[in-house]
């Protein structure tokens, strides 16, 4: 059976009090609507239509070709929003799910189960519900004497008795697609808001003797809608807790989960230890037996088995097996560290390739460079790579030793087994097996201060 999805993402989000389009506010480093799209796609849906309004181009820019789009010029209610997908879906057969773009915690597993429940029951519609202690603001699930759905009533249209009901509609539905678009044309806006409500489609189906199911989830967090910054922070916390829980169950030690942020796309191997205050974002992959020291930040990087990152920042970089970084080092985009490399305190590496066993232990800048195997770069060494207009490359061969306080003025090549004396400013290439000294000779005047 074909499956389709409609993501409702046209709301202005005035309660966010933001210039940013509501569904583009981020949870765990990713726009809310992108979380929703990934869960929808993961549930086995064949085609997705996202309903957009003001800020449509921004949403399209994030979701790209993963979705089709329909524009809702006026926000006249959820049924009206769904009807905007008519040109894409009206003639389709199968099941269509409707999901709100501000529910970033919904999982593909719950959507899969909702669809399966709906199709197994041969229902025309199924609503995802949950029981919560404080149902204010949600539509209530009103059941009849036999316990089946009678109707869904919105908060502003509910009687006091209905407001006392704690089973709520999540705003997530599964429909027989043909039935959905037939009934949408019959929805009226005679309610307190003057809007066209999608839950009224369920009442129309019931009035015609159709089957409407309720599938209740036990995970209330999943259906949390985000309407303001307070709810955004709650969703962030819930996502963080869920992600950290997943990694811990898969063999990762997270010493203080409450202070540790790990993005949803991060991969971490077993027996890795994450210390307090760490942030790991983007498409980062961390191997086994790694230690990520407290207050480190890692973005879109690869850390191989046995490496150790201590109180450092790693952006768009790769760190080889058993390599030590930090404390207080910065790996900028393009930094590539081989195995058994050491990058020590107050070292900055940018667009540089440090081969296996290379060492840059303290107070150095290595940019646009290649450092050979087992080469030692002394304290205070600077690759002088920029002339004000262009960047130039520094190459240092293997098994070389660069003394302290050396300037390597690019473009320059230092060969293998070279010794560069401390305090030198190197402007010319140095061949293999050489000693390079480029500094003024010391003059000592005895008794000068007497």
Swiss-Prot record:
One of its GO terms (cellular component) is membrane. SUPFAM superfamilies: Nucleotide-diphospho-sugar transferases, Trimeric LpxA-like enzymes. Pfam families: Hexapep (PF00132), NTP_transferase (PF00483). Mg(2+) binds at residues 102, 227. Residues 230-250 are annotated as: Linker. Keywords: Acyltransferase, Cell shape, Cell wall biogenesis/degradation, Cytoplasm, Magnesium, Metal-binding, Multifunctional enzyme, Nucleotidyltransferase, Peptidoglycan synthesis, Repeat, Transferase. Acetyl-CoA binds at residues 385-386, 422, 439. Its cofactor is Mg(2+). Residues 251-450 are annotated as: N-acetyltransferase. GO terms for molecular function: glucosamine-1-phosphate N-acetyltransferase activity; magnesium ion binding; UDP-N-acetylglucosamine diphosphorylase activity. Residues 1-229 are annotated as: Pyrophosphorylase. The keyword Acyltransferase applies. Its EC number is 2.7.7.23, 2.3.1.157. It is found in: Cytoplasm. InterPro entries: Bifunctional_GlmU, GlmU-like, GlmU_C_LbH, Hexapep, Hexapep_transf_CS, NTP_transferase_dom, Nucleotide-diphossugar_trans, Trimer_LpxA-like_sf. Its main location: cytoplasm. It comes from the Bacteria. One of its GO terms (biological process) is UDP-N-acetylglucosamine biosynthetic process. It catalyses: alpha-D-glucosamine 1-phosphate + acetyl-CoA = N-acetyl-alpha-D-glucosamine 1-phosphate + CoA + H(+); N-acetyl-alpha-D-glucosamine 1-phosphate + UTP + H(+) = UDP-N-acetyl-alpha-D-glucosamine + diphosphate. Pathway: Nucleotide-sugar biosynthesis; UDP-N-acetyl-alpha-D-glucosamine biosynthesis; N-acetyl-alpha-D-glucosamine 1-phosphate from alpha-D-glucosamine 6-phosphate (route II): step 2/2; Nucleotide-sugar biosynthesis; UDP-N-acetyl-alpha-D-glucosamine biosynthesis; UDP-N-acetyl-alpha-D-glucosamine from N-acetyl-alpha-D-glucosamine 1-phosphate: step 1/1; Bacterial outer membrane biogenesis; LPS lipid A biosynthesis. Binds 1 Mg(2+) ion per subunit. UDP-N-acetyl-alpha-D-glucosamine binds at residues 8-11, 22, 72, 77-78, 139, 154, 227, 332, 350, 365, 376. In the N-terminal section; belongs to the N-acetylglucosamine-1-phosphate uridyltransferase family. Homotrimer. Catalyzes the last two sequential reactions in the de novo biosynthetic pathway for UDP-N-acetylglucosamine (UDP-GlcNAc). The C-terminal domain catalyzes the transfer of acetyl group from acetyl coenzyme A to glucosamine-1-phosphate (GlcN-1-P) to produce N-acetylglucosamine-1-phosphate (GlcNAc-1-P), which is converted into UDP-GlcNAc by the transfer of uridine 5-monophosphate (from uridine 5-triphosphate), a reaction catalyzed by the N-terminal domain. This is Bifunctional protein GlmU. The lineage of its organism: Bacteria, Bacillati, Bacillota, Bacilli, Bacillales.
